[in-house]
Amino acid sequence: MGKHEFLTPKAIANRIKAKGLQKLRWYCQMCQKQCRDENGFKCHCMSESHQRQMQVFGQAPDRVVEGFSEEFLDAFLTLLRRAHRHSRIAATVVYNEFIADRHHVHMNSTRWATLTEFVKFLGREGHCKVEDTPKGWFITYIDRDSEQAVKARLKRKRIKSDLAEDERQERMIARQIERAQQSMGKTNGELGDDASPDGSEGESGSADEYSDSENDHEGQEEDAKEANKAAGKIAIALQRAVPGPKVNPLDDKPKVKFGFEEEDEVSARDKEKEELAKKKGKDAINAAEARRSALDELMKEEEKAKERSNRKDYWLCPGIVVKVMSKSLAEKGYCKQKGVVKRVIDKYVGEIEMLESKHVLRVDQDELETVIPQIGGLVRIVNGAYRGSNARLLSVDTERFCAKVQVEKGLYDGKVLKAIEYEDICKIFH
């Protein structure tokens, strides 16, 4: 029987059928061929081209199914992004729009057997926000387009620049502290040299004393010669009896002494030196204590400045474990359940992936709580002076609702914070 004419009703009906969606059971995904009836599908399965495609499938079935699954996922998300980008819509509506294209990848050739299984996969992978309602599954596309990626990149760049500025200021303050400590050590060493009993002052004092005694001897000799020239022998005898002193600069005290008065003067001078050394030592100690107190005050002021600059009214950050406390989500079983912050939106809203169900929720930070790990666990400091640093939990004070942590890595590596509030630290997800 020949073909129908171009404008006959039968030819028109055939063209309409060719454009529309035929029965799913008569479609061959490997050959991407739609048959109109059972007889045509049977003939296609017996064809040589179909047999070759089935041999290819038999060599690597998992790879073929995975390829069809990726194509199905990409096409479905493309349709959802273009048609329902910012709306909450039923999954069946989107699926019906998707299969309206006769060249779409059929679901029975993918690794998902049902639409419900595919929707759960979208929620687990974070492609969509998934809600199970009495009317069925509803999905909302999570927009991760280039515009938001650019905004996130600019935000990360701004945060890095702020952190770099803070690190520069902290290095400058650390250098100032080192210089202050070095100057304190130098002043202490100079004061110790001045107060030592074997110093230059003792040597100069003995030399002056020797010169005075020598001048006195010369004056006495000249007077004796002018008064009585005949008594020269007596003067010579006196000079021999009282010889001039031999000065050794290493000796502490002069060896020449003239009676008890000079001994008293020497002892008084020694006492004055000791008192002066003690006074200088006390002054040095007081000066060192004053410098230390000034240094402590400087460090406290710097700590307060960091606290003021890093204390914010938002604390969410990716990678931490939080507890959902929203009463509106209690009916769905999410209340008091833990999840991981995957992304932060506008500083105050977080995308939370629940640990048990793997569902992705958007929750405000007011309806979230921080999670404290066991002793020895890693935490992130989410607010306060050391915001953004990782630390290890050392102990917990349940009466004061605070914890003791030790900062790890970074500029403050090894610093111990003795009392940090529960709200300022949160468990890190491993």
Curated annotation (Swiss-Prot):
Residues 376-427 are annotated as: C-terminal subdomain B. It is found in: Nucleus. Keywords: Coiled coil, Metal-binding, Nucleus, Zinc, Zinc-finger. One of its GO terms (biological process) is DNA replication. One of its GO terms (molecular function) is zinc ion binding. Pfam families: C2H2-zf_KIN17, KN17_SH3, SH3_KIN17_C, WH_KIN17. Residues 209-224 have a biased composition (Acidic residues). The keyword Chaperone does not apply. A motif (Nuclear localization signal (NLS)) lies at residues 155-158. Residues 147-183, 283-312 form a coiled coil. Residues 51-160 are annotated as: Winged helix-turn-helix (wHTH). Residues 261-278 have a biased composition (Basic and acidic residues). It comes from the Eukaryota. The keyword Cell wall biogenesis/degradation does not apply. Residues 319-370 are annotated as: C-terminal subdomain A. A zinc finger (C2H2-type) spans 28-50. Its main location: nucleus. One of its GO terms (cellular component) is nucleus. Residues 179-230, 261-284 are annotated as: Disordered. Belongs to the KIN17 family. This is KIN17-like protein.
